A protein has these predicted regions:
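Patatin-like phospholipase
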Residues: 1-40, 50-250
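Gly/Ala-rich beta-loop-alpha elbow adjacent to hydrolase catalytic centers
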Residues: 41, 45
Length: 250
């Protein structure tokens, strides 16, 4: 296991709720604040971190306020017809073309940037550190929520789906790799705990083509709440600070 330095920044995903961490990271950029040794992002959190490491304040706010709301991105009709609810291919193509990403800034930063993904064939979490050339595809994989996005994203011959399925907030992994001072940017208020899924049978049926994902999808709440317990009661010698949205945040 690759060891990292002591100071880690972890950014939770959460679709549109990622606008909260986006705002914090934009402020960090304005203040030139980046005292971290490693970066960990899942789903929308990975996308926000990419803009932060590319030093592009305001970039992802445009995605939340404009591109994410366009009919090209979310299409229930397409999903009913057997396609994807979210067109991640369109999202990455159009935003890379119109907003760009500073590849040279990303390449110049030697600090590891881990993207949390879930293997489609066994439901296990993996933490990938892609090259700049593979970053967009890996971010797409980290955001490919099963059911909403039907077939996962293939990276080096392996299919992956949203990292939030197996490990939504990779605090334990960061600790295992040597992080002792951890900041977590959350997408949910501090009081939030994930509930058991309401439609277990429906989820199982919709995932019949990917049986290895059924159990991880139905037990997400258990792992998520265990991570919250770890954040609130870290092991001796580990300091964890979480920054959460206000209680009314939806």
């Amino acid at each position: 296991i690759e060891q990292v330095g002591s100071r880690a920044l972890i950014v939770e995903g959460g679709a549109m709720r990622g606008v909260f961490s986006c705002g914090i990271l934009d402020h960090f950029m304005e203040q030139d604040f980046s005292p971290f040794d490693s970066f960990w992002g899942v789903s929308a959190g990975a996308s926000n971190l990419a803009a932060y490491l590319a030093k592009m304040p305001g970039r992802n706010l445009k995605i939340y306020l404009d591109y994410s709301l366009r009919k090209e991105f979310i299409s229930p009709t397409q999903w009913i017809r057997g396609g994807d609810m979210m067109d991640l291919n369109w999202m990455w193509e159009v935003t890379l073309k119109e907003l760009g990403i500073d590849r040279s800034a990303l390449s110049a930063d030697p600090r590891p940037f881990f993207l949390g993904v879930t293997r489609q064939d066994n439901g296990q979490a993996e933490y990938l550190t892609p090259s700049v050339d593979m970053l967009a595809e890996t971010m797409k994989a980290s955001s490919a929520l099963p059911i909403m996005y039907r077939n996962g994203v293939s990276l080096d011959g392996v299919k992956y789906v949203d990292g939030g399925v197996a490990d939504a907030i990779p605090v334990a992994e960061a600790i295992q790799r040597g992080a002792t001072k951890i900041m977590v940017l959350r997408s949910r208020p501090a009081s939030y705990h994930k509930s058991k899924p309401k439609f277990a049978k429906l989820i199982s049926r919709l995932l019949r083509d990917h049986p290895a994902l059924v159990e991880p999808m139905l037990t997400r709440h258990i792992r998520y709440n265990q991570t919250l317990e770890l954040i609130e009661n870290p092991p001796t010698g580990i300091k964890i600070m979480q920054v959460c949205p206000p209680e009314g945040f939806k």
